[in-house]
Structures are given as C-alpha cells and as structure tokens.
Regions:
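Conserved N-terminal catalytic core of the sugar/cofactor nucleotidyltransferase
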Residues: 1-5, 33-104, 108-119, 123
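N-terminal nucleotide-binding beta1-loop-alpha1 segment
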Residues: 1-21
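Short glycine-enriched loop/turn motifs at secondary-structure junctions
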Residues: 21-22, 47, 102, 167-171
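Short glycine-enriched, charge-decorated loop/helix-capping segments at active-site entrances
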Residues: 23-29
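Short beta-strand/turn micro-motifs composed of small residues
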Residues: 12, 55, 103, 132-133
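Conserved core of the sugar-phosphate nucleotidyltransferase
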Residues: 109-178
Length: 179
C-alpha cells in the first residue's frame, strides 16, 4: 500500500531508564538491528515515505543510526507524547492527509498492522485512531479506559491507575493515526 499522503512521526527522544544502559534504548539491537531502525523501516514498508524522528536524549546516537534519509525534530525536555509530536509541527504545515505517530521502541510492529490502522482511520473517518493490545499482564503499560458503549474515554498511565484500572488488560500500544 502506498501512503504518499501520510507523514510518520517516530518518537525517539526517550531515556529508557528501565533498561539501565549508558546508551539510548533506541540504539539497542534486536537480531543485529537497532530498535529505532526497525520501527522506521516498518513504517517505510507500510508505504510511508515522509518520516520525522523526534529525538532528544542521546540524539546523536539515534541520528547516526537513522541517517540522513529522514527529517528530525528536537525535544530537549521530555514532556510526554503530545509534546514530542508538537516538536514536529513545522513538518505538518500545509500537509494534507494523515499523521501516523509511533513510538521508536516498537521494533516488532508489522507493516501490515500499520496499514490496517491507517485503513481503519480513513474508512471510519476518524480524527484519531489508536492501536491497542490485550495483555494478560499489563503491568507497566498505559490502560485503555472505555465507556459502556465501548468508546475510548482515556488512557491512564500505570503510575496513575487506581485499583480498578489496574485490572484493565487493554493497553496503549503507542501507535496512533490522526487526520
């Protein structure tokens, strides 16, 4: 599927403190290839040609891995996903079409899954579509809170969950499509 009218924003600024590494988590390798490189390549395999990486912590490492074929935006303060996306706003000016946002630490996401998310977003004429997953043990992930009709009411990060929300097994996969 060609996704010429889609721009991808890859969030690649995080510290990855839980990994306890002196290097960025994004340059750690899985089967010989850096995590962030796999995420970008999967977006490219999904037909997305216009990619912006939002870099911050150890940005030189991440930029060296990703090279010069993509654009960069800089996040000096780690203030969350929304703030990271806002750092790429100059690349969104005058753009028509969808914006695919994905975390740089999702190396195993399949291009087919990204295409299905984009297709559903277009088909349903949604302004915001997000990918979720069901985990037996959702510890550490943001929970998807839904209303009685099944509509998403919000995403509650692990540290902010109450006892009832801790039981929710549907998690935020960190991949979104916006119109």
């Amino acid at each position: 599927m060609e996704n010429d009218d889609i721009i991808a924003i890859v969030m690649a600024a995080g510290k990855g403190t839980r990994m306890k590494s002196k290097n960025s988590k994004l340059v750690q390798k899985i089967y010989g290839k850096e995590i962030v490189k796999r995420a970008v390549e999967n977006a490219q395999k999904a037909g997305v040609k216009d990619i912006v990486a939002v870099v911050g912590y150890k940005k030189e490492e991440v930029m060296k891995v990703l090279g010069e074929d993509i654009k960069y935006a800089f996040q000096d303060e780690m203030l969350g996903t929304g703030h990271a996306v806002m750092q790429a706003k100059e690349y969104l000016k005058g753009k028509k079409g969808r914006v695919l946002v994905l975390n740089g630490d999702v190396p195993l996401i399949r291009p087919e899954t990204l295409n299905k998310l984009i297709e559903k977003s277009i088909e349903n004429k949604e302004y915001a579509t997000l990918l979720t997953a069901i985990y037996d043990d959702p510890t550490g992930y943001g929970r998807i809170v839904r209303d009685e009709g099944g509509n998403i009411e919000g995403i509650v990060e692990e540290k902010d969950t109450n006892e009832e929300q801790k039981k929710i097994t549907e998690i935020n996969a960190g991949i979104y499509c916006f119109d």
